[in-house]
A protein has these predicted regions:
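A short, conserved alpha-helix in the catalytic core of glycosyltransferases
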Residues: 235, 245-271, 300, 433-438, ...
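Short beta-strand-to-loop acidic/aromatic patch adjacent to the donor-nucleotide binding site
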Residues: 154-165, 416-429
Length: 625
């Protein structure tokens, strides 16, 4: 099929799916943005400014890989019947790097009808000694990549496809990032960068993949690392390179095995790789290569076996995504804490949904009565205790509303292995909601906290994880987007790591709650959940979010903020400042699971205005385990 026609059909299919997922207005808005970027957008918007690249070249002028001061990175690229134009553009992107610390290792499995591949490479070899080449028998992508690795002389390796393009500062940036990690005393064995998709020219990229820092739960659901990944050759040798039995998802499999050895990875938020979209490429969707899913599930199942974990691997909610259904260890008891003041209609809806829909049987519910004034409320409590077996109602002794204090008080009556903070204005949607929350925590190496997908009654997202720094303090991922969509890089449809989740539905190990001292009562209304999650994260635990636990949250979308009441506004401002004081403003504004190239003004994962970090070629690197 003609490549342009193929691309047109892919875009049409994307538009249809986007309309189904998020509605016609969103599709039209997104489509207009695409046309604007493609036809009128600033050229090379993900590349550093020209003066930055010139400064890098000046710094490295006259130097070789041996004396440039940067670690040598050998790029492994299997060749197979590569179109001449694509091959030349790829080779040009290597030889035009701003630093000389790269080596290009080419293993050519092209058939006899594509002898021009060898001819073209040999022409470049005659000019550039940093290109090494070997003609090989075609044994599949993994084996061919392993053959390329046999040519490598570098301390580090990187993977690049034969039809893609390296950003001009890729080798310089990765080399400097490795030196930064060493200076900081952090592991330097495994790094990855951001990437962008393009069809014709990297001067007109289609979209960037701005990734989070290392996120192990997210990596189990999709290969978000992808390009450009750089890792020590010693690690590659230790794990035996790529596995042919995972052809199609060989890189995903490799990254899982590398992470098992390193315990994490370092992320460089620069676009260092351009992934070409054309007929037959995986960047165009796994429909082009359907064997990818089977290979990915094998890679994940083997990862579970190697790490001693038990569970099953299934397809995810969208193509290219997967789901690990962890086996829950034992029969943990969950204590559900529900603060309540009057509003018995909301509470009844909540309790009824818990008792009639929840498949997990080992739970208790503790309603924490907080200064109700309607006599009918207490009549309701009496009736509810008769209707719902085991329901407890305890009386919070303090006056006023303090969400933290109320839940801390309720903890005293809880006997569960886990606590579930739950608002009284939520309603259970799926029977295995509690099972799915437990699934992320109640297994060896599981998260300490897990949050749920909360939806407004109009089927838009209210909560899909919390991103710190949005709006200056914190915001909800993908808020107001139509439910059922994939979100940015599948982030509204996969189990993943977050810095925080909302206290409207938050499962936490009771032992961890006690370890960090519960909720901070200085956060009476706002940010108590964010503060709690950050303290748990700082104690070395992980926070997860799952789309497989769904509840309706009847919080009003149009509810006004506390700024309308002077007293509440002062309290809210004080809690904002306390969040900065306790955790540091810089830490709040840099959420490791949210890319610095994304906006801080909205909750839609759109690009930030200006992309200053990219234009300045700013080299920052963060290792996470």
């Amino acid at each position: 099929m003609n490549v342009r026609l193929k691309r047109a059909r892919e875009l049409a299919g994307y538009a249809v799916q986007l309309t189904k997922d998020e509605g016609l207005p969103t599709m039209l808005k997104r489509g207009a943005g695409f046309v604007k970027r493609r036809c009128f957008g600033k050229r090379a918007r993900y590349l550093p400014a020209k003066k930055v690249l010139e400064a890098q070249r000046a710094e490295m002028a006259g130097k070789t890989a041996a004396d440039c001061g940067l670690p040598t990175i050998s790029i492994l690229t299997p060749l197979y019947n590569t179109p001449e134009k694509y091959l030349q553009e790829f080779l040009d992107s290597f030889v035009n790097q701003t630093a000389p610390n790269g080596q290009l290792c080419l293993a050519d499995a092209s058939d006899a009808e594509h002898a021009d591949v060898k001819r073209i490479v040999e022409e470049y070899q005659a000019k550039y000694q940093r290109i090494v080449y070997k003609k090989i028998e075609n044994k599949g992508i993994a084996a061919n990549t392993n053959a390329a690795a046999e040519l490598a002389a570098g301390e580090y390796l990187a993977l690049a496809d034969h039809d893609d393009i390296l950003a001009p500062h890729a080798m310089y940036t990765m080399g400097k990032a490795i030196l930064q990690l060493r200076a900081q005393g952090e592991p330097d064995g495994f790094l990855y960068s951001d990437e962008a998709l393009f069809s014709k020219s990297i001067q007109r990229p289609m979209v960037a993949h701005f990734k989070p820092d290392y996120a192990p739960d997210y990596l189990l659901c999709c290969n978000y690392i992808c390009h450009l990944a750089v890792f020590q050759k010693a690690l590659w040798d230790e794990i035996g390179g790529e596995r042919p039995e995972c052809d199609g998802s060989q890189d995903h499999d490799l990254f899982l095995r590398l992470a098992e050895k390193t315990g994490g990875a370092a992320h460089v938020p620069q676009v260092l790789y351009y992934w070409r979209v054309h007929a037959g490429s995986t960047s165009g969707g796994t429909d082009a290569k359907p064997y990818v899913a089977a290979a990915a599930k094998k890679a994940l199942a083997d990862h579970l076996a190697r790490t001693g974990c038990t569970g099953t691997v299934e397809d995810g909610l969208f193509p290219s995504t997967y789901r690990v259904k962890w086996d829950i260890v034992g029969d943990p008891k969950v204590s559900i804490l529900i603060p309540n003041k009057d509003h018995t209609d909301d509470l009844e809806k909540c309790l009824h949904s818990i008792w009639t829909k929840t498949s997990w049987e080992n739970f208790e519910v503790i309603v924490i009565e907080n200064n109700s004034t309607d006599p009918a409320t207490f009549t309701y409590y009496k009736e509810a205790r008769q209707r719902y077996d085991g329901l407890q109602v305890v009386n919070y002794p303090q006056k006023g509303f303090n969400f933290s204090g109320i839940n801390n008080f309720g903890r005293q009556y809880a006997s569960g292995d886990y606590l579930l903070l739950l608002n009284n204005d939520v309603e259970v949607r799926n029977a295995d909601w509690l099972t799915e929350l437990l699934r992320q925590c109640a297994h060896p190496g599981g998260a300490a906290i897990c949050g749920a997908e909360l939806l407004y009654p109009d089927e838009t997202l209210q909560h899909a994880g919390v991103v710190t720094g949005l709006g200056g303090y914190a915001g909800h991922s993908h808020k107001y987007r139509k439910a059922g969509g994939s979100g940015y890089m599948f982030r509204a449809a996969t189990v993943q790591d977050f810095s925080a989740v909302t206290g409207a539905c938050l499962l936490v190990k009771t032992s961890v709650w006690d370890e960090v001292g519960g909720l901070d009562e200085a956060f009476a209304v706002a940010f108590n959940d964010v503060d709690f999650c950050l303290r748990v994260r700082d104690a070395g635990y992980r926070i997860a979010w799952t789309p497989y636990a769904q509840l309706t949250h009847y919080e009003s979308k149009s509810r006004g903020g506390d700024e309308k009441d002077p007293v509440k506004a002062r309290r809210f401002a004080a809690e904002q400042q306390r969040l900065y004081a306790v955790h540091g403003k810089a830490n709040i504004l840099h959420d490791p699971y949210y890319n610095p190239n994304l906006t801080m003004d909205r909750e839609d994962f759109s690009e930030s205005n200006g992309l200053r970090g990219l234009k300045e070629g700013r080299i920052t690197v963060q290792w996470r385990g």
